[in-house]
Regions:
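Glycine- and acidic
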Residues: 108-117, 133, 222-229, 251-255, ...
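Catalytic or ion-translocation cores adjacent to nucleophile or general acid/base/metal-coordination motifs
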Residues: 227-228, 233-244, 248-251, 255, ...
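Short amphipathic alpha-helical "interface-anchor" segments enriched in bulky aromatics
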Residues: 128, 427-454
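Dynamic "connector" segments at or just before major functional cores
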Residues: 2-180, 184-192, 213-232, 240, ...
């Protein structure tokens, strides 16, 4: 018991009167000895503390076992914390509104399936109905047949409408914001999917695959656009398809970040003509890149302070050239092009050391009578002239010193090209953010069930769309965690803890009532 009063001089409240009754133990009041000595009449009475009052247990209403069992039989625990957070994020970032607009009859089921992939990445859709019955995912606990029907019902026009809405919400391409574009391969065991084909599969060259192209907003990390492609299509030939799609989806200028896989004079000219800003990794065998490296590297290797940029931690220099083109279709064209050359001494030492170890391993294999079948072996070892074919491999091949000199000339060097960004440090900082698209692919494959494609032809596009939605939700969650000072790598653990929070659903004759279990202090904001 206590009574507070106001101190006018100190302008604060203070305790005017306080009486200690006892302490609270497991919901029951344990009266203190001093209080009982002064109030012996309360010795044998059990008290509980409710609504900030001491109430005798005998005055509380009693509930018989039959009533308790009746309530419990209509009350079901649901894992709900993770789905609640993901749905709130979807609501705040506009994803939920876009789903409702494009899929007015199925948005709940689509969102539920996407959240299922995020929360339970190790499970497949065959377990969805069982999991959904014990989770607050929303939508209906669909069985495999109903899921297939839902996936098949998602049309190309609906997917285009949805991505158009997401692209228009993005600020990419405005105020010098960039979108990162890249592709990944997904292996498939299917022998009937039309887009499955053999190509450059980094994970398993012996397996056919499909390709997924993905466009990521570097500002907020959200995937904005994706496309399922034939597995045999090379990266260098994809940009034309991208521009055609984006022209239909968005009428504002875009800026792209591209890796070396898209580096070709044809692609650069196509981006110039389409007024697409870009920062791209340049291959060393590209003529304009090789010429610029030869001109700038001698100065950079001197490590003069004027070439050092502390913001990127390496030496850099820029050369502006004019990109010329003359064709019958377009006439004479001229565009400004900025070539940024970077030199990192630590990277140089690492590249030389790694290649030295690889060369030594080739020599050891030759000593054993093996001829390595590797590009770098063919680059640094040449067949000796006038040697019969029957000699031992170690006597048939010799180390090519000139190739090694050519290799070391560009060690520690890397080159970027840009149509817009004139500053070398700024260009590299933007390019480094491209690792978001790499992380997105890893999340797609490892955390969202995208390592293998197992579905029928008619459901393929729908399955990829659901996985794309789940990737959006996961990356949005990671960005929230990062802004709050948490490590995004802890996302699986955060999801697991959130999913342990229970929501009780009590069925009534009218509308089901929902009650949250007490949330532990460490999980509260």
């Amino acid at each position: 018991q206590y009574e507070n009063a106001w101190d006018k001089e100190k302008q604060r409240s203070y305790s005017k009167h306080r009486t200690t009754v006892g302490k609270l133990v497991n919901g029951k009041v344990q009266l203190g000895r001093k209080f009982l000595a002064n109030n012996p009449q309360y010795k044998d009475i059990e008290f509980k503390f409710e609504d900030h009052k001491l109430i005798a247990a005998s005055d509380l209403p009693t509930v018989n076992d039959a009533g308790v069992n009746a309530v419990l039989s209509k009350t079901f625990p649901l894992n709900a914390g993770a789905s609640y957070v993901l749905k709130e994020i979807a609501q705040q970032d506009g994803l939920l509104g876009d789903l409702k607009a494009v899929f007015p009859h199925h948005w709940k089921d689509l969102l539920a399936l996407a959240m299922f992939f995020v929360i339970y990445p190790e499970r497949n859709l065959a377990n969805y109905d069982i999991t959904a019955a014990h989770s607050q995912l929303g939508g209906n606990p669909l069985d495999s047949q109903r899921i297939s029907e839902l996936l098949e019902s998602i049309t190309a026009d609906q997917r285009q409408q949805y991505m158009k809405r997401r692209l228009n919400h993005s600020c990419g391409g405005e105020n010098n914001n960039f979108w990162a574009f890249d592709t990944t391969s997904i292996s498939s065991y299917s022998e009937i999917l039309s887009k499955v084909a053999y190509g450059h599969n980094k994970e398993d060259p012996e397996m056919p695959m499909i390709k997924i192209a993905l466009l990521i907003d570097e500002t907020n990390g959200e995937p904005l656009y994706y496309k399922v492609l034939n597995g045999s299509i090379a990266d260098v030939s994809l940009l034309r398809n991208l521009f055609v799609d984006l022209a239909q989806l968005r009428d504002k200028q875009i800026n792209l970040v591209l890796d070396k896989g898209f580096c070709s004079e044809h692609n650069f000219l196509m981006m110039f003509r389409n007024h697409v800003g870009f920062i791209a990794g340049l291959r060393s065998d590209l003529a304009i890149a090789a010429q610029t490296v030869d001109q700038l590297m001698p100065s950079l290797r001197l490590a003069l302070p004027e070439y050092y940029s502390p913001t990127i931690g390496c030496y850099c220099a820029t050369k502006q050239i004019d990109w010329y083109s003359a064709t019958r279709a377009h006439g004479k064209e001229q565009y400004p092009f900025y070539i940024h050359v970077y030199y990192d001494k630590q990277r140089e030492a690492s590249e030389i050391l790694n290649m030295t170890e690889l060369v030594e391993s080739f020599k050891a294999r030759l000593e054993k009578g093996e001829v390595p079948n590797a590009p770098y072996f063919r680059k640094f070892f040449k067949k000796k002239k006038d040697k019969p074919d029957g000699v031992k491999p170690k006597d048939l091949y010799e180390f090519d010193v000139q190739s090694w000199v050519t290799f070391t000339r560009t060690c520690g060097c890397f080159v970027l090209g840009s149509s817009e960004v004139k500053s070398a440090p700024e260009a590299l900082n933007i390019y480094r953010q491209k690792d978001m698209v790499e992380k997105a692919f890893n999340n797609y494959k490892d955390k969202c069930g995208g390592r293998r494609i197992r579905c029928r032809e008619c459901a393929l596009e729908g399955k990829v769309f659901i996985t794309y939605l789940s990737l959006c939700l996961r990356l949005m969650l990671e960005r929230r965690l990062e802004k709050a000072g948490n490590d995004p790598l802890n996302t699986p653990r955060v999801l697991e803890r959130l999913n342990s929070l229970v929501l009780y659903r009590h069925e009534t004759d009218d509308k089901p009532k929902l009650y949250w279990q007490g949330i532990p202090q460490e999980d509260r904001l």
